[in-house]
Every structure is written in C-alpha cells, then in structure tokens.
A protein has these predicted regions:
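Radical SAM/AdoMet-radical enzyme domain recognition
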Residues: 2-14, 21-134
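Pocket-edge positions in alpha/beta enzyme catalytic cores
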Residues: 17, 77, 145-148
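Gly/Ser/Thr-rich loops at beta-strand to alpha-helix junctions
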Residues: 18-19, 138
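A C-terminal junction/extension of Radical SAM enzymes
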Residues: 135-178
C-alpha cells in the first residue's frame, strides 16, 4: 500500500526461490490487482493449479531460469531441472501466460544460449523475452573459469542487441542486464 501511495505499481520478486511462497504471492496479486508482479523463478514449482490462478488474476509474469540445454542446465541447477522448466513453459503457454527466461551466461554457455536454435526453442515454448545476466563468481561453487573474456563480453552485447532488433528473424525481446 505504501508503494502505491508513492506511485509504484510494478514489483519484481526474486529469491532464493520466491515460488516456495506461491500462496502468499497469489494472495498479494489478488489484493493488489492494480499492480503487476514479475517473478524470477527456477520454474520447478509451476504446476497446473498455479497456472489457472495466474490466468484468473492476470497481473503476474515470470522469468524462468535456464542456462542452456539439459546437460549444461542440469550441471548448474540440478538433475532433471531442465525438463521441469520445459514442462512449466508448456503449461504457461497452454494457459496463455506472460513469461520469459532469465539466462545466466558464462564463458562455457554464451554461444549456445544466444544461438538461433536455442532462442527459437524458447520462442516456440512461448517465451516473449529473455533477461541475460553475466556470471558472477560468488558462493561455494564460484569459479573464475566461467567469467567471460572481454571479447566474449563484446559478442554478448552485440548479439543481444541484434536479437532485439527488427533485423533478427527470432521474435524475442532480449535484455542484457548489467
């Protein structure tokens, strides 16, 4: 309520994993139906029941974390997570929900996650946007080997801009979050 008094009507929810509180999020979205909520999630807790509620409410959108195809994604996010995210995308598309992806790119996956094939797969799944975040070495599994070189970074800047441009046949709104 204080935020609305300040003129703020768009909220971004991040984690940990915000969907562990999905009942609270749905209650918040219903109470504040004049606001929009964008949720960054790993996608593993998205199910049919949630999709029906989100469809009914109409003021939530999602960014699902994905870091490449199954092997690459699951190496970083856990075994079977890629398939769960693909299933979540299928459910969201089936219910006409607004969603995109959140992609952490590294020196190992940056070409794959910006390839025509990968991006078209996301569009075919129903994604309309992709947030790109460069890898930051923090936490117990931090690795400086995953940092991009200046040349790789320049490639990402140019590629993300190209995909977002009208010259690209892939219709996906891309943002490189710096």
């Amino acid at each position: 309520t204080e935020a609305k008094e300040l003129g703020i009507h768009f909220f971004v929810l991040t984690g940990g994993e915000p969907m562990v509180r999905k009942k609270d999020i749905l209650m918040l979205a219903e109470k504040h139906n004049d606001c929009a909520f964008h949720i960054f999630t790993n996608g593993t807790l998205i199910d049919e029941e949630l999709c029906k509620e989100v469809q009914r409410l109409g003021n939530l959108s999602f960014a699902l974390s994905v870091e490449g195809y199954a092997e690459t994604n699951d190496d970083r996010r856990g075994q079977g997570v890629f398939e769960k995210v693909m299933h979540a995308m299928d459910l969201m598309k089936e219910h006409g929900l607004l969603f995109g992806t959140s992609i952490c790119y590294t020196s190992k996956n940056y070409k794959v996650v910006t390839s025509d094939e990968f991006l078209q797969m996301l569009v075919d799944k129903g994604a309309i946007l992709s947030w790109f975040f460069h890898y930051m070495p923090v936490g117990k599994d931090a690795s400086t080997d995953l940092l991009l070189t200046p040349e790789q970074r320049e490639y990402m800047v140019e590629r993300v801009r190209f995909v977002r441009s009208r010259k690209c046949p892939i219709k996906l709104f891309t943002l490189d979050f710096q």
